[in-house]
Amino acid sequence: MAGAGSRRERTAVKRGVPDRGDVLHIDLDPTEGREQRSKSYVLVLSPADFNRFGLVLVCPITQGGGFAREHGFAVSLSAAGTRTQGIVSCHQVRTLDYKERGASWVETLPEEIVDDVLARVRTLLD
């Protein structure tokens, strides 16, 4: 994953295709149960090659996240030097149609944060 402001990043954003590590502002409704609701920030986990089909695999970013914090499924953004703050809830992975949900690009997170999130998601699958 390239750093913020890289040529790859600008091209992907210009094409309107999010890439792994991008933060999007997106409408998460409709939701059920404990799923995060309304217009929220999400971290894109899937690569641009997949996302070009109109779907993204994401984890929500929240200011709460009690369960995620207590059980090791939270990655904090507080010391990441990013505009987006809160925690990435690694246990609430979902696939979204970013075009239909009116997603807008916010920023790209540092590679070490994205790698930490991916590692925690993998523990759910192993």
Q: Where are each of the predicted segments found?
A:
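Conserved functional hotspots at enzyme active or ligand-binding sites that engage polyanionic ligands
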Residues: 1-126
